[in-house]
């Protein structure tokens, strides 16, 4: 899922890379099948047997309805997915504009997915303390950056995979929280 007319180019399209590339992908984001835990592997035939032996017990036997949904997603027109990507882009633009107006916060526009990595270092709070404040006092949830590695301390990850109404409420609450710091 990418925005702003950016183009994705797989490494497999580079000369001599196709046979050396392993693509692992799923249906969660683009086909709105989050939590269904189904995906696929694209690789050179010589790599398939070792990969299947390695992963068989952790990825085998998805539910029948999930398998059928994945097949349908691949066969059907992706108009609904394209419309959802456009909606996510609209939400991303709104969130970035609003988040960049918050006291002590800054973010760049992500080129894909539905998460924003918000820089909160100017607030003086750790990412954990920031998340606890937002959740416990203002009922807005997000993920502290430190869970993504030590270099991500001072950031929080915010999802905009929600309704515009809820995102507007979250922005109002975050603004109120930061005005009291």
What do these predicted regions represent?
Residues 1-181:
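PLP-dependent class I/II
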């Amino acid at each position: 899922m990418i925005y702003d007319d950016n183009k994705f180019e797989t490494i497999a399209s580079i000369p001599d890379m196709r046979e050396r590339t392993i693509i692992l992908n799923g249906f969660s984001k683009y086909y709105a099948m989050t939590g269904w835990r189904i995906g696929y592997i694209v690789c050179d035939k010589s790599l398939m047997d070792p990969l299947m032996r390695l992963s068989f017990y952790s990825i085998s036997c998805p539910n029948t309805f999930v398998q059928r949904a994945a097949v349908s997603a691949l066969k059907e027109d992706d108009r609904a997915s394209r419309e959802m990507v456009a909606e996510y882009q609209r939400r991303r633009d709104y969130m970035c504009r609003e988040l960049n107006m918050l006291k002590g916060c800054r973010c760049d526009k992500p080129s894909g997915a539905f998460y924003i990595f918000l820089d909160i270092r100017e607030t003086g709070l750790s990412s954990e303390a920031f998340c606890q404040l937002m959740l416990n006092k203002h009922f807005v949830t997000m993920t502290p950056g430190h869970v993504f590695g030590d270099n991500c301390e001072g950031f929080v990850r915010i999802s905009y995979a929600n309704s515009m109404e809820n995102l507007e409420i979250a922005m109002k609450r975050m603004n109120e929280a930061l005005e009291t710091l």
